[in-house]
Amino acid sequence: MSDVSIARTELEPSVGKILPEKHFTVTDALLEDYFEGLALERGPFDRGETPVPSMIATDADNYFSEGAFRQQRGHLWMRQEWRFTEPLQRNETYVTQGRIEDIYRKRDRTVVNTAVTLSDSQGAQILSFNHHQSFLLDAPVEEVQFREPNKKPGMRKFIVPDGEPLAGFDCDITLEMCGQYFHGNKSYHTDLQASKELGFGDVVVGGRMTMAYIGHLLDGHF
């Protein structure tokens, strides 16, 4: 194996790979992009009636470049698991540590499961999460085709569980909102050309945004 091949292999994700330690700060600019990008009312937070939104932590999920395959055309977020110990604090800096926990197959995709912990300055763990990112490695396509949910084979029927229902809300996500939520960074979540370069026909609304709306509902309920 050549030195180039060895270097490329080392750059690809592998189970057990330790990712570099990073720092994450809950800045005022971050909070502004969160509330404005999601078009959420921030009055209760500014008045001290609610804590820092739980899903501000999605910005600590920044290990894509270290945990992604080189073939990124058509890659998509698949799912996320969150475990919170206590709320994040405004203007506090936290340490993130990551590790690739698993790589598995899901239909025609290869999924990288990255486990991340976030700790405060005293070393106490504040939260942890697992990010599942999927990649098309077998036969990358020119344009990614999405299936209609009701046409998927073996589609599971969702049964509403017992319990107290959460009050929902409607929100139309605009391209401008996507741009602000992702801090003006150009990506397939904010820019049509960047999206087409990855095989998508339109800008892809970031999974972090949809998770943030769910987090907003849960924060308000509990």
Label the model's feature ranges.
Residues M1-S2, S121:
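Polar low-complexity intrinsically disordered regions
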Residues S2-R79, P140-F222:
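Hot-dog-fold acyl-thioester-processing enzymes
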Residues M78-Q122:
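Hydrophobic beta-sheet segments that form the core/acyl-binding groove
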Residues K106, D138-P140:
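FAD-binding core of flavoproteins
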Residues I126-F129:
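A structural microfeature
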Residues H132-L136:
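Short beta-strand edge segments in extracellular beta-sheet folds
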